[in-house]
């Protein structure tokens, strides 16, 4: 009897540790989910549009489902659909993918500190990073009692699942849709406008936002609508790196 009591007593710390870990994971999920609700609306509509688009090209539902799960890069998935219809040209696909998604290089640099200490979750966080997940994970004020690694993991996972679900719905039920889906992609543009406004409202002074906006407009004028993103991000990264300390002092002094 005493041995049983001793074994229960010895195992209780392990049980408590397991329960604490589960509660931490659940708390991170509950904190992350509300942030992803706007993404759910955008990804669902855009994912459905992508699934319908793939169906219109003659692909079965399995194609948008697998591509949305494995690629998870909205704009490139639309481009990849056309690659599947043309001659096999892997180098062209490689360079076009790098050009379209080169902004992720800057996302990765920005998230180096935030991803530090996340353990094995880092691999999925890197794979699943998209514009929307980056925006949330970089700007969200995570509560002190919530594990930031699990918070970022669930933000990334939920956004990924939303996109796959939308693509699956569009691919499966695409043959039943008879309305014109042109313009559905504007949902994501509207979403980024909302994210920008929220970030603007959080800042006491808007130096960084105005810098990003001004440099983006200048790059758009100089390089045109198809090639302005990379120059704009390089300019923003350089200017904000040089002015980082003055900007931080200005924010603190307010």
Swiss-Prot record:
Disulfide bonds: none
Gene Ontology cellular-component terms listed: plasma membrane
Membrane-crossing segments per the record: 33-53, 65-85, 153-173, 177-197, 220-240
One Gene Ontology biological process: L-valine transmembrane transport
Membrane-topology descriptor: Multi-pass membrane protein
Keywords noted in UniProt: Amino-acid transport, Cell membrane, Membrane, Transmembrane, Transmembrane helix, Transport
Classification via InterPro entries: Brnchd-chn_aa_trnsp_AzlC, Brnchd-chn_aa_trnsp_permease
Domain of life: Bacteria
Subcellular location as annotated: Cell membrane
PANTHER family attached to this UniProt entry: INNER MEMBRANE PROTEIN YGAZ
Function: Involved in branched-chain amino acid transport.
Sequence similarity: Belongs to the AzlC family.
Protein's name according to its UniProt entry: Branched-chain amino acid transport protein AzlC
Organism phylogeny: Bacteria, Bacillati, Bacillota, Bacilli, Bacillales
